[in-house]
């Protein structure tokens, strides 16, 4: 029951850490830069969880698995290799020899020698004479071999040491190669986590109809609309140029009849004409009626009093053309930027929705893995399981902050059951007890090597989200400066280091 108690506690930790900031900040008019900074902090937290918790823990499990495998092989060798010593006496002669129990040739030699020794004595053979003859032969052989004993012992010791050195080097090389194979297990998990999320994101991209390509199309359509509007205005300006040139001749003929009062009235009329032109241009560009644009502007010019004609000279006409050209270009730029802004806003919403779904899947996998780890730790010992479970409870608080930051950055909260963010918070919380239940009752606990793979898998999902989803969104957004974004990411990384040090310092 303690396994499920700790699993439920580990599930409640992200539920509380995500619900409190979400329900506190969702109805407040907070600047968009605040949500952007929260997103940056969540990126730092995710990368810290992957690099400082999951990957080191998976490496530790892989090394422990290697040590257990080495101990098992050593114990098997020690149990299968036993030495047997036999002593047989024939009169005053003692025969002693050691045999290795796992060698069939040595056992056969032992049995044959034992049979020879235990044969009945030959009739008429005097054992005393045999003993004396044997002793004389042995003394002569001992005297002959005294000089060679030292040399043989030195050579044997040298050969034995050389064989031990070669055997030790071979064992060391084999051990290092085996350790490398065990350390590859977390790396396999990281790669598998990347592959799974790539498949998930490609599925959601195909469902959304290729959201990534929409951004490019929005820019191209915006440029096409701007170019067509530019053609309309350029035609209008060229027509006005021809009309103004014709009017310049009449204006030059009537320059001598001008006075100061007429100049003041001309300036007022000139402003009215420009204002009418600008208002008509904006309305007609938004409605995409190119022909009506020219007609309305020409009518506004024709309906002006005749007092403008005798006093408008060449300089005034040039000023009017410059003002009209600048106002028309600014109108087109504004309309193009509005269209592009709407399209980019739609693309950002699509990216944020895919980002949140991908993050939700990764956090769900991570919560499931936490339940599996708690179950595996308790299967080794209750003390180790309790410490691992408490560590997971503390480390899951940043997970809730990550999810709440991502959802708050969207600024869209629906009241439906399946569209409410609290529903997804609850699902993530339930994944930890579910992982403990499946690991304990269905699989009977995971081995150390399997745990290393699972932790590596969770680390791979977090690194994928941080590097391919959150960081591009942060760097492409211009709400705050890039230096502020990078500092916020670093702040999130330091926040996890602080929480981790406080927890380990307490223990």
UniProtKB/Swiss-Prot annotation:
Residues glycosylated per entry: 31, 240, 298, 328, 342, 351
Glycoprotein recorded as keyword: yes
Signal peptide: 1-18
Function: May transport divalent cations. May participate, with dstA, in the regulation of the differentiation of stalk cells during development.
GO BP: zinc ion transmembrane transport
Family under the similarity heading: Belongs to the ZIP transporter (TC 2.A.5) family.
Biased composition (Low complexity): 125-137, 221-258, 333-350
UniProt feature, compositional bias: Acidic residues: 138-154
Spans through the membrane: 35-55, 185-205, 355-375, 388-408, 422-442, 451-471, 486-506
Domain of life: Eukaryota
Compartments, record wording: Membrane
Keyword line: Glycoprotein, Ion transport, Membrane, Signal, Transmembrane, Transmembrane helix, Transport
Protein's UniProt keywords contain S-adenosyl-L-methionine: no
Alphabetized GO MF terms: zinc ion transmembrane transporter activity
Main location: membrane
Bias (Basic and acidic residues): 155-179, 317-332
Matching Pfam families: Zip
InterPro entries: ZIP
Topology of this chain in the membrane: Multi-pass membrane protein
GO terms under cellular component: membrane
Annotated protein name in UniProt: Protein zntA
Record region (Disordered): 124-179, 209-264, 305-350
């Amino acid at each position: 029951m303690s396994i499920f108690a700790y699993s439920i506690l580990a599930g409640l930790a992200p539920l509380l850490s995500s619900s409190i900031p979400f329900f506190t900040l969702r109805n407040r008019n907070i600047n968009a830069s605040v949500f952007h900074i929260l997103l940056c902090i969540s990126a730092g937290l995710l990368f810290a969880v992957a690099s400082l918790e999951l990957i080191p823990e998976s490496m530790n499990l892989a090394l422990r698995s290697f040590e257990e495998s080495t101990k098992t092989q050593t114990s098997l060798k020690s149990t299968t290799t036993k030495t047997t010593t036999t002593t047989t006496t024939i009169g005053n002669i003692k025969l002693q020899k050691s045999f290795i129990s796992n060698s069939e040739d040595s056992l056969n030699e032992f049995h044959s020698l034992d049979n020879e020794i235990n044969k009945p004595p030959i009739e008429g053979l005097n054992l005393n004479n045999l003993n004396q003859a044997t002793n004389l032969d042995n003394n002569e052989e001992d005297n002959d071999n005294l000089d060679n004993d030292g040399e043989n012992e030195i050579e044997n010791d040298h050969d034995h040491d050389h064989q031990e050195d070669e055997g030790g080097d071979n064992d060391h090389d084999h051990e290092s190669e085996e350790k490398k194979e065990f350390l590859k297990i977390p790396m396999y998990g990281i790669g598998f986590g990347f592959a799974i999320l790539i498949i998930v994101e490609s599925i959601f991209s195909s469902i959304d109809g290729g959201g990534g390509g929409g951004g490019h199309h929005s820019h191209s359509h915006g440029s096409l609309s701007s170019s067509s509007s530019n053609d309309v205005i350029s035609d209008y300006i060229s027509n006005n140029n021809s009309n103004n040139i014709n009017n310049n001749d009449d204006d030059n003929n009537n320059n001598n009849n001008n006075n100061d009062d007429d100049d003041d009235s001309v300036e007022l009329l000139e402003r009215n004409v420009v204002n009418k032109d600008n208002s008509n241009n904006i309305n007609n560009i938004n409605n995409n009626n190119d022909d009506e644009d020219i007609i309305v502007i020409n009518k506004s010019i024709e309906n002006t009093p005749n007092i403008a004609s005798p006093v408008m000279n060449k300089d005034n006409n040039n000023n009017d053309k410059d003002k009209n050209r600048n106002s028309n270009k600014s109108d087109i730029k504004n309309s193009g930027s509005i269209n592009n802004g709407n399209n980019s806003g739609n693309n950002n919403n699509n990216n944020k929705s895919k980002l949140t779904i991908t993050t939700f899947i990764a956090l769900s996998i991570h919560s499931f893995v936490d339940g599996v780890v708690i179950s595996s730790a308790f299967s080794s010992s209750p003390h180790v399981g309790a410490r691992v479970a408490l560590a997971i409870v503390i480390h899951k608080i940043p997970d809730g902050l990550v999810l709440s930051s991502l959802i708050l950055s969207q600024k869209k909260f629906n009241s439906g059951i399946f569209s409410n963010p609290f529903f997804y918070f609850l699902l993530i919380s339930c994944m930890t007890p579910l992982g403990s239940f499946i690991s304990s009752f269905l699989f009977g606990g995971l081995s150390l090597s399997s745990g290393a793979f699972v932790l590596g898998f969770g680390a791979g999902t977090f690194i994928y989200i941080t590097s391919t989803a959150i960081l591009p969104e942060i760097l492409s957004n211009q709400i705050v400066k890039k230096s502020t974004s990078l500092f916020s990411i670093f702040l999130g990384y330091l926040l996890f280091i602080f929480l981790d040090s406080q927890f380990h310092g307490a223990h």
